[in-house]
C-alpha cells in the first residue's frame, strides 16, 4: 500500500455542501475580522514606534571630556550697558576668572541702554559658580540694575529628541524684569549627567539640571554689596540614561499569531454556542424537546 503523505494534514477540508452558513456566523465573522484588524494595526504601530526607556546609575558617563562641561548662556539685561557686563567663573579647584571673554558676544539693546550677553565656556566637574556682574568693569557703577531675562542656560550637547522631556534648559524664559533693580539673584543648580543612546548604539552626552532661586539685597560691614546674577552649581552623582528600543520582530510575529489564533478560537466557540442554543430553541418550539 503506497504511503499517503496527506495523512499528516491536521487541517482536514470539509466539503461546502456539508456546511451550513448562518446570519449569526456571518455577523461574528465580520466582527472577528474587524477586531483582528484593529489589534493588528495597534501592534504594528507599537512595533514601528521607537520606545525610550530610562534608567539611573552612579557613574561619570563622559569620562573623555577631560573633567569639563560645556556651558551655553544667553541672557539679557535691559538696563545695564554692555561695557559694564562681564562673566566671572570660579570653583573649588581654585579657578577664579574675572571678565571671561572667550567665545562670548555682547549685543547692545534699547539704543545702548541694555545688553544681551551670549557666551559659551567650560566649567570643571566640581562645585563652583559663574556669575554675570560688573566686577570686571574699569569704573564701577553706583547702582547697577540687574533685572534680566534668561533666554538659555544649558550644559553639554543639546538634545532635541521628541520622546525625552527633560530639564535641559530649565531656566529658559526666566524673567526677572520686575525684580528689585538693586537685588542680587542666586540660582542654585543641581546638574544631572544625562546619556542618550539611539537604536544604533551611538551615545550622546548632555546634562539636565534642577534649579532653586532667591533674590536679595546684600550688605556687608562697609555697606551695600554690588549686585550680581549668580549661578551656583553642583553635580549629582546619579546619571540618567535614555535608551531607544524597538520591539523585536519575533515578539511582534508571536503577538500577531496569538491575536489571530485567539480571536478565531473565541469567535468559533461563541458561534458554536449560539448555533447550538438556536437549534435547541427550534426543537423546543417544534415540540421535539420537552
From Swiss-Prot:
Q: Where is the protein localized?
A: Endoplasmic reticulum membrane; Endoplasmic reticulum-Golgi intermediate compartment membrane; Golgi apparatus membrane
Listed GO biological process terms = endoplasmic reticulum to Golgi vesicle-mediated transport
User: Does this entry carry the keyword Endoplasmic reticulum?
Assistant: yes
Keyword Protein transport in annotation: no
Q: Which Pfam families match?
A: COPIIcoated_ERV, ERGIC_N
Q: Which residue stretches are annotated as topological domain Cytoplasmic?
A: 1-26, 276-290
Q: Kindly list every residue the record annotates as glycosylated.
A: 74
The organism's superkingdom is given as Eukaryota
Q: Modified after translation how?
A: N-glycosylated.
Q: Lumenal compartment: which residues?
A: 48-254
Please give, as recorded in its UniProt entry, the membrane topology of this protein.
Multi-pass membrane protein
**Signal peptide annotation:** none
**Transmembrane stretches, by residue range?**
27-47, 255-275
Chief subcellular site? Answer: endoplasmic reticulum
Q: Which UniProt keywords apply?
A: Endoplasmic reticulum, ER-Golgi transport, Glycoprotein, Golgi apparatus, Membrane, Transmembrane, Transmembrane helix, Transport
Might you report a single GO cellular component term?
Golgi membrane
Q: Which family does it belong to?
A: Belongs to the ERGIC family.
* Annotated function: Possible role in transport between endoplasmic reticulum and Golgi.
Record's subunit section: May form a heteromeric complex composed of ERGIC1, ERGIC2 and ERGIC3. Within the complex, the interaction with ERGIC3 is direct. Interacts with ERGIC3/ERV46.
This one is known as Endoplasmic reticulum-Golgi intermediate compartment protein 1
The protein's gene is named: Ergic1
